[in-house]
């Protein structure tokens, strides 16, 4: 039996982060967590990290796809926050972002890490952006790095 596992340290990784401006008071913390994890744990060099801001979570798949198609990046990290309101808007935005990002990963064959919070309240979002429930931006960054190494091991 063969088992493939990989570490997260990826010093030569080239990583793009696409991040939504909408709810930026939460997303800024996700970005800080992602960049900290990339540099501190993944040992990624500052010059190998690109950050692209988009209006909202719904635009993340388009930006992620454009970044992936350049061939310049080993992974893309998508960060954003969608908070449920009183209308069906939440389902459309959260579903569109999730499905779109999964499609980009499958088409581009590079990791596209999902760091989009989909919460019932602002309080839940704040908890997941660096307080009680950790930082989902950092978790997405570590997922991206591990998947870079997993794919390398599969192809080796």
Curated annotation (Swiss-Prot):
UniProt entry keywords in alphabetical sequence: Riboflavin biosynthesis, Transferase
Catalytic reaction(s) noted: (2S)-2-hydroxy-3-oxobutyl phosphate + 5-amino-6-(D-ribitylamino)uracil = 6,7-dimethyl-8-(1-D-ribityl)lumazine + phosphate + 2 H2O + H(+)
Pfam families hit by this protein: DMRL_synthase (PF00885)
An example Gene Ontology biological process: riboflavin biosynthetic process
Residue positions binding (2S)-2-hydroxy-3-oxobutyl phosphate: 86-87, 128
Residues binding 5-amino-6-(D-ribitylamino)uracil: 22, 57-59, 81-83, 114
Enzyme Commission no: 2.5.1.78
Segments crossing the lipid bilayer: none
Pathway assigned in UniProt: Cofactor biosynthesis; riboflavin biosynthesis; riboflavin from 2-hydroxy-3-oxobutyl phosphate and 5-amino-6-(D-ribitylamino)uracil: step 1/2
GO CC field: cytosol; riboflavin synthase complex
Recorded superkingdom: Bacteria
GO molecular function: 6,7-dimethyl-8-ribityllumazine synthase activity
Active site: 89
Cross-referenced CDD domains: Lumazine_synthase-I (cd09209)
Family: Belongs to the DMRL synthase family.
Subunit structure: Forms an icosahedral capsid composed of 60 subunits, arranged as a dodecamer of pentamers.
Purpose: Catalyzes the formation of 6,7-dimethyl-8-ribityllumazine by condensation of 5-amino-6-(D-ribitylamino)uracil with 3,4-dihydroxy-2-butanone 4-phosphate. This is the penultimate step in the biosynthesis of riboflavin.
Protein name as it appears in the record: 6,7-dimethyl-8-ribityllumazine synthase
């Amino acid at each position: 039996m063969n088992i493939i596992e990989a570490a997260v340290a990826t010093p030569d990784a080239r990583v793009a982060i696409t991040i939504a401006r909408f709810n930026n008071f939460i997303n800024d913390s996700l970005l800080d967590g992602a960049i900290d994890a990339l540099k501190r744990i993944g040992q990624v060099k500052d010059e190998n990290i690109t950050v692209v801001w988009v209006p909202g979570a719904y635009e993340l798949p388009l930006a992620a796809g454009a970044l992936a198609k350049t061939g310049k990046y080993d992974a893309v990290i998508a960060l954003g926050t969608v908070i449920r309101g009183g209308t069906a808007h939440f389902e459309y935005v959260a579903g569109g972002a999730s499905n779109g990002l999964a499609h980009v990963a499958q088409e581009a064959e590079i990791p596209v890490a999902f760091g989009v919070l989909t919460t019932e309240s602002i309080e839940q979002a704040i908890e997941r952006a660096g307080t009680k429930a950790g930082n989902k931006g950092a978790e997405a960054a570590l997922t991206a790095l591990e998947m870079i190494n997993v794919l390398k091991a599969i192809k080796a």
